Amino acid sequence: MRKILTALLLFLSPLSFAQEKVSLADISLKTLDNQTVSLSQYQGKPLYIKMWASWCPICLAGLAEIDDLSGDKNLDFNVITIASPGQKNEQNSPKFINWYKGLDYKNITVLLDENGEIIKRANVLGYPFNLLLDKDLNLIKVQPGHLNSDQIKQFAKE
């Protein structure tokens, strides 16, 4: 019984957290080219964020699908990915950037949350982790685990 209750609490806590509408509009992140960008540049359209790590095999297996989805110009939401160098056992920024540049993805926007600000505000418990922000960049939905392209589209609609 205790195990079931613990599992239920772990599953439901991120969902209830998202109802607080935490704003992420003021967060600045780094690009792979060390440029600073603000999430506010994505205002005006819902924003889907895939939180992931280089050590996560499930995350890596889903990158090709995210690459395809990111290249779809007919979506009614934006798609980005965020890694957090130096957080949750992720390698540091220079190592992560060097590693990622060895991959062959053309469409994925990868931003770096070096201070773990999004991890803290969105209560990211593990990877992969999915976030949906409304057009004003308020956190409205979270979902742990892998989502394929069709599931992401459904996640962004609900």
What are these model-predicted stretches?
Residues 45-47, 52-55, 126:
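Short pre-active-site segment immediately N-terminal to redox-active cysteine/selenocysteine motifs
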Residues 4-13:
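Sec-dependent N-terminal signal peptides
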Residues 51-65:
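Conserved redox-active cysteine motifs that mediate thiol-disulfide chemistry
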Residues 61-102, 114-120:
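Structural microenvironment flanking redox-active thiols in thiol-disulfide oxidoreductases
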Residues 48-49, 79, 130:
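Hydrophobic beta-strand anchors of alpha/beta hydrolase catalytic cores
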Residues 16-39:
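N-terminal "domain-start" segment that seeds a small globular fold
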Residues 102-106, 113-155:
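Thiol/disulfide oxidoreductase modules built on the thioredoxin-like
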